């Protein structure tokens, strides 16, 4: 639905613009690549292709727990800005370059009866939203 709305809005805007407006220079967009990390007890992944305009030289984006796969602190970074969220109380957000990204939590029990906590951050992007998540065994 979001993509359909964006396409309709883009078509409406293009009909409203005169041909001279199409000749105007637009800022190029840079592919932002979400780094994937794997390790015992947690995984970090991205969902969807995303293009985000960047004003710095960074072309990478990292989302990770602390070393040792400790989910008490999550780290978000685009190479220039970094923020850490203490998630022990399950109520903190991540802020990157003045933008706040809420952290969502889920607790589940896997097939082996182990309790797992998953922290997820949704990042709205120009094309598709990016969902980053990390999970660890609850202690």
PLM features: what roles do these ranges have?
Residues 50-55:
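Short, solvent-exposed loop/linker segments at the N-terminal edge
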Residues 39-49, 79:
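Small-residue (G/S/T/A) turn/hinge positions that recur once per unit in extracellular repeat modules
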Residues 10-18:
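Bacterial N-terminal signal peptides
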Residues 58-113:
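Surface-exposed interfaces of beta-sheet-rich extracellular modules
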Residues 102-138:
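Extracellular interaction modules
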